[in-house]
Amino acid sequence: MDVSSVHVKNVRDVSIRRLLLFLSVAIMGLRFVESVQAHDPDPPEVIIVPEVTTSAERPVAASSQQFIPDKEILLQPQGRPAQVLRLIPGFITVEHSGGAGKADQYFLRGFDADHGTDVAFFIDNMPINLRTHGHGQGYADLNFIIPETIQGVDVVKGTYHAEFGDFNTAGAVRFKTREVLQENVVQGAGGQFDTQRYLLMLSPTKDKVRTLFAADGYYTNGPFENDNRYFRFNVMGKATMNPTVRSEFSVTGSYNKANWNASGEVPFRAVADGTISRFGSIDPSEGGKTQHAIGRMEYHYDTPSNGRFFADAYLMYYKLDLWTNFTFFLNDPVRGDGVNQHDQRYMYGGNLGYEQAGQLFGIRSSATAGLQVRNDSIANIRLGTQTKRTATGTIVESAVEEASYSPYLKLELQPLPWMRLVGGVRADYFTFDVQNLCETCPQQPTGRKDSAQVSPKGNLIFGPWFNTEFFVNYGTGFHSNDARSTVAGGSTPLARAQGTEVGVRSKPWGGERLELLATFWWLDLNSELVFVGDAGTTEVRGPTRRYGVEVGARGQIYGPFYVNGSFTWTHAQFKDGLAIPLAPDLTAYSALIMRWPEGLSSQIQLTYLGVRNLTEDRTIKAPSWLVFDLTERYQLPIKLSHGRFEAFLFVQNLLDTDWEGATFAFTSRLPNEPAGGVQDIHFVPGNPRFFMGGLAWYF
């Protein structure tokens, strides 16, 4: 048996021991709860509370915090689950190189967050970002999510919230799944480029056990000359029950599988001289395949003393193979510069905690203490060379065991009717264990390293006066860096971020009418990750500073007319004065929604991404773009013996604008060009005007 196989066995044994330890703690907690229940004076029978829709305001700790309800999600174009993120002020998503089946590129608060390096994503309480990922640190692929199963999206920005840790520098996004459906759904849709989508959602039981089953399939060839052949299949099942009058338990399982072709990044010079069209390709063999299998459990018990014990656990199996070619024939003039990135892992962990509300010295208060545990057991992470998806060499191949243990404490106090304090602290302890699996590779990272960080948080909320609140926020946070770079000494294990913001939210007309918000924020980060074209990965750079302004408005403006709009300005640069590549200065989003009493809902949206520097010396810039989308949903006036029909239409890029998604500047070489290559802008073309319509049966 070789050294690598022994190491993999050892790290798996360690992983199993850690999991057993965590489960033991969870079981002890559950036994404690059961003992409390045994003395609970409340009657033992189970009471099932029906689902109730409410529009009550959630208290927030920052002017930039928000909740996106499902009614806004359903008005987004279908096909890319990440579309919902543009409802967040300043959040832009675009398709990245490598094809539609992989994670999008995310922009927020002056970050090109790549695939999630500085934005933390969650589905319920399970983290989505993947540490030490084969394609990029914090990789967050949202394509396993079925948008119609989402009840709402919680959004926070900045480093001010104790319950969020790794990757929460620019912000955090939590998708909350439904428990049950009021109506079952069967839906079919189709559009240009051979696009098809089919959806089935059912709630077979809605009483003692509330169940949800959903499945969707999606296929498109896209507008490219090299057909995408993108196929995605998702299935999800969830069951929720109340073991006692004060407790709730849910279990969720989901599976995702996708494969696709990609046209890669197009060099501007090849389009300008007619070598290829905007939707052509230099290397048509690019693409990928991926799969997720996820299991999650959640439990909470509400004590008679106004407290809550909560626990959850998750396990995910994940696999990705990605074939790309960024520089074409720069490094290998004969076979080409194709790159293969492979990632195969298990991720598991969970949360334990207790929340208690009450009075502290006569002051309304709430305290939450929790522990978050996570382990990424990566059996194989590989970067290699390939030609037409056939491996030609290996650059680095590793096995990684990366774990974190994160206790946190959160306190909420209201000492005065017009003042709230929300603060806390979290500690994060990481272990990085890397084993080399390739004795002949040019890169052979190996070793073990530990790192810890303490992150204080503080928020002051003043008001409300005349439906207006004022916010002051401060906190520190971090993103972790790739374990391979960490053990090799090339990067700080935990890149510290320090942020602050002040803001105001106001509903001058009250009720469901227009809400206005404005925020000024500031963020320092001591280690930046930037894109490297040669390998299609990221590298660690120096400290950066960002600051900016966000303004927004959302709500009812008159009768059936609603608006959701935002504008952001950001200044971002390295502390030595150089520009941060890809950081946008300006973003804007606006949606006018019309909810007609005849059963028709209409929405027109605009999304704007401003000019971005592509190089640190500011000599090459990516152009800005402005795209309009149209959505129509209409409840058909057809009487059915059971249920109702709804028709829908999405028109993306309504004005058929030529625009660019992911855009980079680096050196590449086409056939017959000089050996040193040519520095140029490379881009993924945005979709042209696209129509998609369908019919849904609700019953």
Stretch-by-stretch model annotation:
Residues 43-79, 101-105, 133:
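N-terminal periplasmic "start-of-domain" segments of outer-membrane beta-barrel proteins
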Residues 82, 86-130:
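Extracytoplasmic beta-strand/coil segments of soluble accessory domains associated
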Residues 126-157, 176, 491, 533:
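Short acidic/polar hinge/loop motifs at secondary-structure boundaries
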Residues 154-162, 171-204, 215, 223, ...:
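Short strand-turn segments of transmembrane beta-barrel domains in outer membranes
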Residues 354-355, 417-421, 430, 517-524, ...:
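Gram-negative outer-membrane beta-barrel transporters
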Residues 190-219, 224-263, 287-304, 348, ...:
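Transmembrane beta-barrel wall of Gram-negative outer-membrane proteins
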Residues 298-300, 308-326, 463-475, 493-549, ...:
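Membrane-embedded beta-barrel scaffold of Gram-negative outer-membrane proteins
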Residues 73, 521, 563, 611, ...:
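C-terminal beta-signal and adjacent terminal beta-strands/loops
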